[in-house]
Design a protein with these regions (language model features):
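Interfacial helix-loop-helix linkers and transmembrane-helix boundary segments
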Residues: 46, 62-70
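Alpha-helical transmembrane segments and their membrane-interface exit regions
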Residues: 51-61, 76-79
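Loop-to-transmembrane-helix entry motif
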Residues: 69-73, 77, 113, 117-120, ...
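Membrane-helix interfacial "entry" motifs
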Residues: 14, 37, 60-65, 96, ...
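Juxtamembrane/interface alpha-helical elements of multi-pass membrane proteins
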Residues: 73-186
Length: 267
């Protein structure tokens, strides 16, 4: 399950999305996430589904590879659905003791699960089609106006990029530690959910030690390369907008306008 996490990983390809400026993809991700909270009913669902399907198709990332990232959050999806299903007041359809399933609860559970699923998939498209270095450059360029009010944009972008880069590293490290403990007789599969959670506790100490060690190695490597922040730094490959980026911005504007118009029409 740990190896199924796709957020933070990069999938090499020569797709249209891979070639886009990272600032365009950052804006596209923001627009798509916002659109998830605008849609209502079947028409809105169809609009955001088409938007997501279009992004996945253009990315040339295999759909099976994209969807496997949902396995790691399956428990969160189930709990989200159950909470909304049983705790949303409305017209009762069925009851199980103190728990009641309502029509509003069914709709709320379905919408929340779909939104969370699409949120993860949409965010995964960004990281799967953008290298960490390009993502850092894109964030820095996009947030550059904040420099005027004293925000250390370069450092913030670097921290976000490192955090994303550490996700697959920590997942791989956790997998190694689990295999080592399984070889020593540890059991992570048997028992109920609470017992499985308790069995994971012994992983925390070696995982934290490994994380601190890797962070220290990274800090030493950055110091050895005389890294001292963004002041005076130049780029080997500076970001530059091309015609396809302008076309992508127009598509984003058309998509977001369509979602807002659809919501207003269905109100």
């Amino acid at each position: 399950m740990l190896r199924d996490i796709t957020i933070g990983q990069y999938y090499p390809s020569d797709s249209v999305l891979h070639k886009l400026d990272p600032r365009v993809k950052l804006m596209g991700t923001l627009v798509y996430v916002l659109s998830l909270f605008f849609f209502r009913g079947a028409a809105g669902f169809a609009a955001v589904t088409l938007g997501l399907a279009g992004m996945i198709h253009l990315s040339k990332v295999p759909f099976r590879y994209m969807v496997k990232g949902l396995k790691s959050i399956a428990v969160i999806l189930v709990l989200t659905g159950l909470f909304n299903l049983f705790l949303t007041p409305g017209e009762p359809l069925a009851s199980f003791g103190i728990f009641k399933i309502t029509e509003e609860g069914l709709k709320s559970a379905a919408f929340m699960v779909v939104r969370l699923t699409y949120l993860i998939l949409g965010s995964s498209v960004l990281t799967l089609t953008t290298t960490p270095n390009r993502l850092t450059d894109g964030l820095e360029k996009a947030l550059k106006p904040l420099n005027r009010i004293g925000v250390p944009v370069h450092e913030v972008s670097m921290m976000m990029s490192i955090a994303l880069r550490f996700i697959p590293i920590l997942v791989e490290e956790t997998d190694k530690i689990m295999k080592a403990q399984l070889a020593r007789g540890a059991d992570f599969e048997s028992g109920n959910l609470l017992k499985k959670a308790k069995a994971m506790v012994p992983l925390l100490v070696p995982l934290f030690i490994s994380a601190f060690r890797r962070a220290n190695d990274l800090a030493l490597a950055m110091e050895a390369r005389c890294y001292n922040g963004g002041a005076g730094r130049t780029k080997m490959k500076p970001l530059k907008y091309e015609k396809r980026d302008g076309a992508a911005y127009l598509l984003l504007a058309a998509y977001f306008t369509g979602v807002i118009a659809l919501r207003a029409w269905l109100r």
